[in-house]
Amino acid sequence: MMSKNFRFSVRTFTNTTARLANYGKPQNPPIDPTLHMRISPIERTGETIDVKRARLVYQSRKRGILESDLLLSRFAKKYLKQMTMEELDEYDKLLDEADWDIYYWATKNYDTTPLPKKWEDSKILKLLQKEAENEERVILRMPELDEGDFINGGKETSLSEVKN
């Protein structure tokens, strides 16, 4: 019985000693602030237009940041059904960007996150910026998910045909 108690107290003492010996020392290696790592988005080939729209609706709604979720889900509900395959591709590439970058670009907060040249002439980003202005001054909430809002029966229409 005595030996079990002795082993327990030795382990506790050793563990405590190790903690005290490392007290005040950094526990993690330093982070290199110049290191930039980006995971390439998945290349999707052979998607039908309806499957692509459905995926983009999901990606617009499930960003992880509430501000982006609200802005992009309302945008998707309003415009996704009318987008052509080329416009959907552009929107897909925009969704590959970081959430806060999209949010700051949509709200034209270029001091925080400068707008890259590749998005300066983007028709989709301009439309998103217009939507972000919220001229109707409505309270933003996640729109209801309805299949008819993003499935267009495989037809392509253009955003220029959308009547606001």
From Swiss-Prot:
Keywords: Chaperone, Mitochondrion. InterPro entries: SDH (IPR005631), SDH_sf (IPR036714), SDHAF2 (IPR028882). It is found in: Mitochondrion matrix. GO terms for cellular component: mitochondrial matrix. Gene3D superfamilies: Flavinator of succinate dehydrogenase. GO terms for biological process: mitochondrial electron transport, succinate to ubiquinone; mitochondrial respiratory chain complex II assembly; protein-FAD linkage; tricarboxylic acid cycle. The keyword Oxidoreductase does not apply. Pfam families: Sdh5. The keyword Mitochondrion applies. Belongs to the SDHAF2 family. Interacts with the flavoprotein subunit within the SDH catalytic dimer. This protein may be expected to contain an N-terminal transit peptide but none has been predicted. Plays an essential role in the assembly of succinate dehydrogenase (SDH), an enzyme complex (also referred to as respiratory complex II) that is a component of both the tricarboxylic acid (TCA) cycle and the mitochondrial electron transport chain, and which couples the oxidation of succinate to fumarate with the reduction of ubiquinone (coenzyme Q) to ubiquinol. Required for flavinylation (covalent attachment of FAD) of the flavoprotein subunit of the SDH catalytic dimer. This is Succinate dehydrogenase assembly factor 2, mitochondrial. It comes from Lodderomyces elongisporus (strain ATCC 11503 / CBS 2605 / JCM 1781 / NBRC 1676 / NRRL YB-4239).
